[in-house]
Amino acid sequence: MKLQVGEKITFERTFTKEDVVLFTEVSKDEGIHHVTPDEQGRFVVQGLLTSTLPTKVGGDHNVLARKMDFEFLRPVFSGDTIRCDVTIEQFEPDEKNRTKIIAMFTCKNQLEKEVMKGSFSGIIL
């Protein structure tokens, strides 16, 4: 599927306690807020785990990332469902006759509160 400027791609995921535990093991990001539940039994999801949402969309379209900017606006907890909307902003050819891509994204939780936003650029393989 060929992407177009202005196109919006959406991906949604619910983060589980198991996701946080596995990411803690792999990343060694063992901050107390990731390994100790809050009073509601929730764990804070690592920011880099949350940031896999826009990278999933890039991966689906064979984007080799060159630059990624993230702004983490509020915490994501285990049990939260996060929707990531990626909007294609620009395409341009590069010096090797490949296509550069620039995209913006925003991620909201199940309450429609923005939890993360940013942009990425790269090359479509």
Where are these regions (language model features)?
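Hot-dog-fold acyl-thioester-processing enzymes
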Residues: M1-A65
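HotDog/MaoC-like acyl-thioester-processing domains
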Residues: M1-V5, S78-T81, T87-L125
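Generic structural detector for well-ordered beta-strands
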Residues: T10-T14, E71, S121-I123
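Hydrophobic aliphatic residue packing
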Residues: V20, V26-D29, V76, I88, ...
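Short alpha-helix capping/helix-loop boundary micro-motifs
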Residues: K67-L73
